[in-house]
Regions:
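Small, basic N-terminal interaction modules of short regulatory proteins
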Residues: 1-83
Length: 83
């Protein structure tokens, strides 16, 4: 899969307030973007997982941390090996 790089300027104050380093903050931003785009229906769970740099099942399981619950049938399909 080819990837494109997008550069976003983050004020130093934000990193200090979050008490995190650039790499961790970037990883969290990718996850948050993936979750929101999935929630809005703009990305499928597979594409959102790609954005978050995760396997699809990992992404679906992680959604609960953000109070987003994927369709039960989607999880059952994955557990049954129909992904």
């Amino acid at each position: 899969m080819t990837a494109r790089q997008i550069v976003i300027s983050i004020p130093e104050k934000v990193l200090l307030a979050e008490k995190t380093d650039e790499e961790s903050f970037a990883r969290e931003m990718r996850m948050l973007a993936a979750v929101k785009l999935y929630e809005l229906g703009r990305l499928s769970s597979g594409r959102a997982a790609d954005l978050a740099d995760m396997f699809r099942i990992e992404f679906l399981m992680a959604l609960g941390r953000y109070k987003i619950f994927p369709f039960e049938s989607e999880l059952k399909d994955l557990e049954g090996g129909n992904a």
